[in-house]
Amino acid sequence: MKIAIGCDHGALDLKNALVSRLEAQGHQVQDFGTYTKDSCDYPDYAAAAAKAVAAGECDRGIVLCTTGIGVSIAANKIRGIRCALLSDVLSARMTREHNDTNMMALGAGIIGEKLAFEIVDTWLSTAFSQVPRHQNRIDKVMALEK
């Protein structure tokens, strides 16, 4: 799977750990930065990753900041993106099964590396349920962009 990833300075260490893990699992990762701990603006990196997913250049995207809130808001401003802020494994599974999310956000100050790995693994391995009522709800949400 080709995965877009982006973060701000507050989540650099977790992003780098995720990149290494994802590549070791055989995923292709497109890293949109940031690459240093210098203070930066999270919307720049979240938008870059989200645009790659929306354009079909990447299959899914992961964005990170200290809480995950800012990057999830920014990613969801890009047409075609359904980004969920995740802090537990159940939500990771449910957001794929019910919402067919194409991006996820993590808060590096909220969860540790081990839990982040579990959340990402679950989110990447869970398929959309294909249940008609879930698709209907997704269609209604996506129609709000028009």
Segments the model singles out, each with a brief description of its role:
Residues 45-85:
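Helix-adjacent hinge/juxtasegments
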Residues 2-6, 10-11, 89-146:
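C-terminal binding/interaction regions
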Residues 6, 32, 64-65, 86, ...:
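Structural motif
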